[in-house]
Amino acid sequence: MRSHFCTEISEKDVGKTIKVAGWCNTYRDHGGVVFIDLRDKSGLVQLVCDPSSKAYEKALEVRSEFVLVAKGKARLRGAGLENPKLKTGKIEIVLEELVIENKSATPPIEIGNKSVNEDLRLKYRYLDLRSLNAYEIFKLRSEVALITRNALAQKGFLEIETPILSKTTPEGARDYLVPSRVHEGEFFALPQSPQLFKQLLMVGGMDRYFQIARCFRDEDLRADRQPEFTQIDAEMSFCDEDDVMGVVEDLLQEIFKAIGHTISKPFKRMPYKEAMENYGSDKPDLRFELPLIEVGDCFMDSSNSIFSNIAQDPKDKRIKALNVKGADAVFSRSVLKELEEFVRQFGAKGLAYLQIKEDGIKGPLVKFLSEKGLKNILERTDAQVGDIVFFGAGDKKIVLDYMGRLRLKVAETLDLIDKDALNFLWVVHFPMFEKTENGYHAAHHPFTMPKNIECEDIEEIEAHAYDVVLNGVELGGGSIRIHKEEMQKKVFEKININEEEAQKKFGFLLEALKFGAPPHGGFAIGFDRLIMLMTKSNSIRDVIAFPKTQKASCLLTDAPSPINEEQLRELHIRLRKPI
């Protein structure tokens, strides 16, 4: 039906008969001469038709998004009529034949216009996908999937599919449940990850497994979350953390070659505690400096009892400083107020600061600091004339969080972030357990191998876990797994899962661990998030063919939707109004 894709045509084809096919991107009638920009997956080429052509009458019928097959001779555009914005901007096709394969209603959205309301774009996603940018995104997504398969296959990994219909084993988020018609009153769950099945594959001697897996989590959505998503999932036997990290680094190096980036190995490693204390995040963005600096001891003799009391509780409280170089000349009073309102959203009671000026130190904190305390702060933060030093004080968790967010906000405001840089990082030595209102739970998941399970302080027990971070975004992570039944039971006990509950939820795993499970570990990389970063897309929805909204609905198909009474009866389900 066609001899060329649109952008395959070049000056060397001048004089040749060309046949192309695609959609009408734009249509113009200039004094009887018709110009059509034809679009296919590769890009645009201009078709031109004057009244002497036998295709002229057909050309007059063409409108936006009509499906066309065109035949004609390639020629150079006239002097001064070239379009440097197009790859084919020096040539055009003089129409000899034109077939309208299909007509189109007036499109409700402008193809490729990102300023169109996103809900409207999602409702007409099949039109939104016609944009050249969308095609490039999904072309790269396909290439990365192929690179992943080839790279892992070369390392001896087998691609094995694990079940989609499984048992509910909550891993932090809520499960999506599927009622069983055959087993009345019982439910399958869609997998939040293939975690337990891939461990069972290691017990089964598969040695190295991977899949590009679909996962499902019924959780509150954010800009980078979807209820169904894809991850590169892998597991390997007889390995340690270095082995797994090496596989991930090799894989990411191959993947980023696809967009022309050379990645240096090994990646930097940073302990979790260092990441939190110095950057206020377990996924720090290291494309810029601005570390958080501990200055609690500088407030020991503060005349402000709030600060001095915080300083005397270094286990649960923090006073952190953030020196922003040159900020005094840039941050007006209104900007400082905006920054204060920003951190208040995350639990701050205010935002104290010192302005380092030619005529001395200004700011609300000066009067509360001793001469020695002020001197130590200036030295420790390397504060110079023109700088502003911000302070956060209070509960450790809250302070680290909002000061970490302030660090990012300031970097964005001052344009300190190199948008083209790729800064990979491993965060390691995670805590095994985290405290909640209902006791402790596993920080990653309860199948992670602890390092020092006998430690009396549960908060000091570390996990054999690791996260890979790119530019402040968690790409993925993994851990070395528990491969002995006794250790798995100990971990369950720590998170208040008694033996009866453990058997009910995870009995099949505990049974498998009795039969000589090998040491094993693995990782998962968020595939959608990876493509979002590689394409510099604004939203994860841009890199998923048919995504859900932030309310977990599909505007295209109007899902979820009600089902009829007959379907409910077959599933032994009766609905009642929420109380």
UniProtKB/Swiss-Prot annotation:
GO terms for biological process: aspartyl-tRNA aminoacylation. It comes from Helicobacter pylori (strain J99 / ATCC 700824) (Campylobacter pylori J99). Gene3D superfamilies: Bira Bifunctional Protein, Domain 2, GAD-like domain, Nucleic acid-binding proteins. It is an enzyme of class 6 (ligase). InterPro entries: Aa-tRNA-synt_II, aa-tRNA-synth_II, aa-tRNA-synth_II/BPL/LPL, Asp-tRNA-ligase_1, Asp-tRNA-ligase_1_N, Asp/Asn-tRNA-synth_IIb, AspRS_core, GAD-like_sf. One of its GO terms (cellular component) is cytoplasm. One of its GO terms (molecular function) is aspartate-tRNA(Asn) ligase activity. The record marks H30, G80 as: Important for tRNA non-discrimination. This is Aspartate--tRNA(Asp/Asn) ligase. The keyword Chloroplast does not apply. The keyword Cytoplasm applies. ATP binds at R217, D218, E219, Q226, E474, G526, F527, D528, R529.
